[in-house]
């Protein structure tokens, strides 16, 4: 929250630095810009999704670190949407249900916004935590990464801002890159980022079957850093996007 307050203060300083007779116009323009793009936040999985939990929650393997991905995804997504809206952006949860909404239905929801608002006025961020194994043991894989669909798209540009933010907030953690196609993000044919009409990325926020990673992402500090990282990436991307228009 400290970073959000800081952003608000910086925003107000920018506004009040203008001439007094320009204040109203500047404020209107800034608020119009911030609400121009629909930011859809997808909280992956649901209460009825099989697996998607720590080895302790799956089979009782020590250490005792309970974790259900659907709960964690929703906690991060809820706070992210709240804080983006608080600073004037048009952010919305894609899934408000607690059950697992199918990928087809999620994609249809996104594409409905694309048809109504124009696909260039919508972005999708799908939030997940990662896993290497099947929940029967603690694994060694660690780190943060983001995925886009195959090929060169605007999604790659969004991912660049996420990797920049990840390097800032997770400087002491492993960042997982794939430079084989000339950019930093990983690519995959994941249904929701492949079939949505708008730019879309999927973030994998460390491994819940790695002991050190799960301790981090379930801590107050870890959650705060993950939320702040997403906010910084989204805001910086949109500010640069506006400048290119």
Write out the residue ranges for each language-model feature.
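Extracytoplasmic/secreted envelope proteins and their assembly/folding machinery
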Residues: 74-81, 104-107, 156-163, 190, ...
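Loop/turn elements at helix/coil->beta-strand transitions in domains of secreted/extracellular proteins
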Residues: 36-37, 86-91, 117-124, 172, ...
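Short, low-complexity, charged amphipathic interaction modules
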Residues: 1-20
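Mature extracellular/periplasmic domains of secretome proteins
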Residues: 104-120, 190-195
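Active-site-adjacent substrate-binding region
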Residues: 155-183
């Amino acid at each position: 929250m400290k970073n959000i307050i800081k952003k608000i203060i910086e925003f107000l300083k920018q506004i009040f630095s203008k001439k007094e007779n320009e204040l109203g116009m500047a404020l209107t323009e800034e608020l119009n810009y911030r609400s121009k793009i629909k930011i859809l936040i997808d909280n992956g999985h649901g209460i009825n999704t099989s697996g998607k939990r720590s080895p302790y929650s799956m089979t009782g393997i020590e250490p005792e670190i309970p974790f259900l991905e659907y709960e964690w995804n929703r906690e991060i997504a809820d706070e992210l949407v709240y804080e983006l809206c608080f600073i004037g952006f048009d952010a919305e949860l894609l899934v408000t249900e607690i059950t697992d909404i199918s990928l087809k239905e999620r994609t249809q929801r996104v594409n409905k916004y694309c048809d109504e608002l124009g696909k260039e006025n919508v972005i999708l961020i799908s939030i997940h935590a990662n896993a290497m194994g099947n929940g029967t043991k603690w694994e060694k894989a660690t780190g943060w990464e983001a995925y886009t669909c195959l090929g060169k798209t605007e999604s790659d540009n969004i991912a660049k801002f996420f990797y920049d933010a990840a390097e800032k907030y997770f400087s002491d953690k492993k960042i997982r890159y794939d430079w084989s196609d000339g950019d930093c993000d990983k690519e995959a044919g994941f249904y929701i980022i492949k079939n949505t009409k708008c730019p879309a990325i999927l973030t994998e926020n460390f491994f819940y079957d790695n002991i050190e990673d799960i301790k981090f992402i379930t801590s107050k500090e870890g959650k705060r850093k993950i939320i702040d990282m997403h906010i910084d990436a989204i805001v910086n991307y949109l500010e640069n996007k506006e400048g290119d228009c």
